Amino acid sequence: SSAASDVYKRQEKGSAIMYSSLDTVWVLLCTALIFFMQAGFAMLETGFTRAKNAGNIIMKNLMDYCIGSVLFWVIGFSFLYGDSIGGFIGTPSLFAAGKFAAAGDLPKRVFLMFATVFCSTATTIVSGAMAGRTKFKAYLTYSAVMSGIVYPITGHWIWNSAGWLKSIGFHDFAGGTAVHVVGGTTALIGALLVGARIGKFDKNGKARAIPGHNLTIGALGIFILSLIHISEPTRLALISY
């Protein structure tokens, strides 16, 4: 009957709204956990380096998010998820204006927050490789370029449905390539450019140990990152499927 059909449609609509709300809550939870990786990186790097570098490292990790997130919101997000130009870069759109199919049924603000913390993670990976060897202003320049250009464009190749790597069947799960390989490769390039730490080698070229100043803080950073990395594939699996 028409009455029964109306009841069924209302129930179906209610279920869809409920599941959509649960998806949103879950993604927000995942966003908070991934954001907390910044604390893990900061503790790890600070504890395993010399005390004189502690303030510099903490500020660099803080600026990775503060500066990086702004640039990602302003232009990087559209480079990553905007309509593809030849499979290499998204159509520029200031402040994530317009619709983005990648968000699916999620509110765009929620999806933007989720994408931003991934960008911050890729940027912060480099900090540890160059800890104690870069000037603060130089690092800020790197952070801006990485967040606004490098990560969004390479991510477009992999995560955008029209990206050139995606179109030939490349599959990235949990950011293994888009976040960790890109961040790790950039860290390697940075380490090669800045060279060894001052005092690392004696006059005969023999390497000398440079112990960290606080192993307790360093260990705390390891535990934070381990917890989040262990749970990361599960979170991404539930979000993706």
Language-model segments: residues:
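Short, small-residue-biased leader/transition segments that mark boundaries at the very start
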Residues: 1-8, 232-235, 240-241
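Hydrophobic alpha-helical transmembrane bundles of multi-pass membrane proteins
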Residues: 13-231
